[in-house]
Amino acid sequence: MSKTYHFIGIKGSGMSALALMLYQMGHKVQGSDVEKYYFTQRGLEQAGITILPFDEKNLDGDMEIIAGNAFRPDNNVEIVYADQNGISYKRYHEFLGSFMRDFVSMGVAGAHGKTSTTGMLSHVLSHITDTSFLIGDGTGRGSANAKYFVFESDEYERHFMPYHPEYSIITNIDFDHPDYFTSLEDVFNAFNDYAKQITKGLFVYGEDAELRKITSDAPIYYYGFEAEGNDFVASDLLRSTTGSTFTVHFRGQNLGQFHIPTFGRHNIMNATAVIGLLYTAGFDLNLVREHLKTFSGVKRRFTEKIVNDTVIIDDFAHHPTEIIATLDAARQKYPSKEIVAVFQPHTFTRTIALLDDFAHALNQADAVYLAQIYGSAREVDHGDVKVEDLANKINKKHQVITVENVSPLLDHDNAVYVFMGAGDIQTYEYSFERLLSNLTSNVQ
């Protein structure tokens, strides 16, 4: 039966994906959010989903209301109105926990690589059989007839605790979100609690020391590069400018050669996890092999464009581990070019907690440009850290730039520009693109 859904904060990456999925399943969907443009709204607008400004008049007691986790009585008029008038609503993760019970569900959790791996699993499985999915880049697909549901499982504030999927991948465990988690042990405990809720199969990266300590009532399968101690092993790697080719073995049995048109060692691991899960779930590996070849990636994860013969890469990387992986991927695809990193730190708490790690990661580039720290709506800038503190720890050529003046980026020949961050780093990218376009116009 068709329902009407209202999303409070519809432009959020998970919220927009869920809105699209429910819309495609035949439901009426609308939502509210701030006016500022966010990359997720393009898909919503293309689907004809109405995006309204926040207003208590948007709410109707006959709607099913889903509220983004960032919106609370102290910062949102719709939440206040709902609370005062007894209008019920569910948080995103609460709704998702009940929704997935109607499917064979497959989650992807982990500190890094969730979105790319969810996208890869969704792409392959939806080409094999009818599948609904939610990807953290704002992409969602819904089918009323789907048996399978693939989703991204987020650890922040332990939002994944309502989830009880049949299968799940955990890509890694790392200390992040220092505004919520108190330590690596705290992060581990959250993932370990989640692991206990998996019912049929848990697939974890076997070369992560923290993941080796995970326990679950479901069978645990380890994947990795090392033959010893892992169930699914990727070997015979061939990394080229067109992607990566590798062989997978399962407990000594050769499952064949696979190719992905994406870059970086981390994507080989993501693919190995997907292969392991789908093999264990009983899917034809020839079909898995065929559809891995056509996976082109997800939004804001190594997204490339060429402006005035200049290669520009946009990536969501905002943690040192992610920066290293992104720069590794750039070097694989462009081995003869200078790798120029343009990075915007995201949140003051993360920058303080991981300052030395950020410097180490950024030193993998040939040159580094830094934007001002992007503060989260969840925090206040107490002046404890400035972007210059990070700049002082970088030993490659570096400079702090402003969005109004990105011309220092022109000081490079034969370079690839890698813009990274989870804030508004794209405004710097667009400023640079305009500069490049103007140079062409002036020459002509």
UniProtKB/Swiss-Prot annotation:
This enzyme's EC code(s): 6.3.2.8
Residues that coordinate or bind ATP: G110, A111, H112, G113, K114, T115, S116
Annotated Pfam families: Mur_ligase, Mur_ligase_C, Mur_ligase_M
Signal peptide: none
Intrachain S-S bonds: none
Compartments, as annotated in UniProt: Cytoplasm
One of the GO biological process terms: cell division
Record's keyword terms, sorted: ATP-binding, Cell cycle, Cell division, Cell shape, Cell wall biogenesis/degradation, Cytoplasm, Ligase, Nucleotide-binding, Peptidoglycan synthesis
Catalytic activity: UDP-N-acetyl-alpha-D-muramate + L-alanine + ATP = UDP-N-acetyl-alpha-D-muramoyl-L-alanine + ADP + phosphate + H(+)
Role according to the record: Cell wall formation.
Name of this protein: UDP-N-acetylmuramate--L-alanine ligase
UniProt organism field: Streptococcus pneumoniae (strain ATCC 700669 / Spain 23F-1)
